[in-house]
Swiss-Prot record:
GO cellular component: cytosolic large ribosomal subunit
GO molecular function list: rRNA binding; structural constituent of ribosome; tRNA binding
The keyword Transferase is annotated on this UniProt entry: no
Record keywords, A-Z: Ribonucleoprotein, Ribosomal protein, RNA-binding, rRNA-binding, tRNA-binding
Region feature Disordered, mapped onto this chain: 1-20
Compositionally skewed regions (Basic residues) per UniProt: 1-13
Record's protein name: Large ribosomal subunit protein uL16
Length: 138
């Protein structure tokens, strides 16, 4: 699963996920893309589950790019532990997603195969997404 190799600090504050994606919002590598319409967090497990769904559908053809990386640690306290005594330990990593962010890209397959693969992947994600085709000259 995806997670940072090293971090300057183990824990991070919660923060707020506001605004729209101004970077990483266009199809850059492949011919087709899966773009976020909604806002939220994607865990490393969700990113991997969607990748597997796409890979299984396109079989041996095509190439997939993952355009997001889970670099924010989410800490949790164990079950049935009283409040206080400091912040919990990092349990998993998430990627904060703004509307307009390109999540995955694909190339080397037909449009209908890519559309179906992205539909299967989108079912694994907690965000609303849309299918994008690269525009000529863009």
């Amino acid at each position: 699963m995806l997670q940072p190799k090293r971090r300057k600090y183990r824990k991070e504050q919660k923060g707020r996920n506001t605004g729209i994606a101004t970077r990483g919002n266009a199809v850059s590598f492949g011919e087709f893309g899966l773009k976020a319409v909604g806002r939220g967090r994607l865990t490393a497990r969700q990113i991997e589950a969607a990748r597997r769904a796409m890979t299984r559908h396109i079989k041996r053809g095509g190439r997939i790019w993952i355009r997001i990386f889970p670099d924010k640690p989410i800490s949790q306290k164990p079950a049935e532990v009283r409040m206080g005594n400091g912040k919990g330990n990092p349990e998993y990593y998430v990627a904060e997603i703004q509307p307009g962010k390109m999540l995955y890209e694909m190339d080397g397959v037909s449009e209908e195969l890519a559309r179906e693969a992205f539909r299967l992947a989108a079912a694994k994600l907690p965000l609303k997404t849309t299918f994008i085709v690269r525009q000529l000259g863009a």
